[in-house]
Regions:
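Acidic/glycine-rich phosphate/pyrophosphate-binding loops and surrounding catalytic core
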Residues: 1-105, 109, 118-126, 130-135, ...
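Short secondary-structure boundary segments
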Residues: 114, 137, 159
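Cys/His-rich Zn2+-binding cysteine-cluster or related metal-binding knuckle/ribbon modules and their
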Residues: 141
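Active-site loop ensemble at the mouth of alpha/beta enzyme cores that anchors a bound cofactor
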Residues: 170-173
Length: 173
C-alpha cells in the first residue's frame, strides 16, 4: 500500500506538470531518487506521462558545475568526447558565456541550470540548431509553463521523485 501511495503521488505530480505545459516540452525526472527506490520511482514518472532520459550516471557523461569548478569547461567537454565510446554527453551550463565557449563541440545535450527565463530563451535559440536542450533547477508547477515556452526540449524536475507527496490510500478488509 505504501508503494502504491508513493507511485501515485509521483505519477500525479508528473501528470500535473504535463497538463500545465501541454506538448511544448517533455517532463523528465532526474537521478535524484530515494535510495533503493529508483526503479519504482522512475516507473511512476512514466505512469504519469513523463520520461526517463537518464537512469543513472553510467548512462551518459554528465558534466556538471562541480566538474567545471575544477577545470576549464571546453577542455572537460573535449576530454569527454575523446572517451565517450558511443555514450551521450550532457553539459550543464548556468550562463550564456559557458554555452558560447562550447558551441560547435560534438556533444549531445545542453542542460541549462537555474537560468532566468530570458537567458534560457536566448540559450535555447543559440543551442537548438546543434543540440538537444534541457532546463533544470527550481522548476515548479508555477513556472513550468514559462520554461516550456522558451522552446526547450526537456524539462527535468527533481522534485517529482525526491519531494512528491504520497497519495492517501487506505485498505479496508
Amino acid at each position: 500500500l505504501n508503494y502504491v501511495s508513493l507511485i501515485s503521488g509521483i505519477a500525479t505530480k508528473t501528470n500535473n506538470l504535463i497538463k500545465k505545459i501541454g506538448k511544448k516540452s517533455k517532463i523528465c525526472c532526474t537521478r535524484k531518487t530515494i535510495p533503493n527506490l529508483r526503479v519504482i520511482q522512475k516507473y511512476a514518472v512514466k505512469l504519469g506521462g513523463g520520461t526517463n532520459h537518464r537512469f543513472n550516471l553510467s548512462d551518459e557523461y554528465l558534466i556538471k558545475d562541480n566538474h567545471i569548478a575544477s577545470s576549464n569547461l571546453k577542455i572537460l567537454v573535449q576530454k569527454a568526447i575523446l572517451y565517450k565510446k558511443g555514450r551521450k554527453i550532457t553539459v550543464e551550463v548556468d550562463n550564456l558565456n559557458q554555452l558560447k565557449s562550447i558551441l560547435g563541440l560534438d556533444f549531445t545535450t545542453v542542460l541549462f541550470d537555474n537560468m532566468s527565463i530570458k537567458n534560457l530563451k536566448l540559450g535555447v535559440k543559440l543551442a537548438n540548431k546543434y543540440y538537444e536542450t534541457e532546463a533544470s533547477g527550481n522548476i515548479t508547477i508555477k513556472n513550468v509553463n514559462s520554461v516550456a515556452r522558451t522552446g526547450v526540449d526537456r524539462i527535468s524536475v527533481g522534485s517529482i521523485t525526491h519531494s512528491a507527496s504520497a497519495m492517501d490510500f487506505k485498505l479496508e478488509i
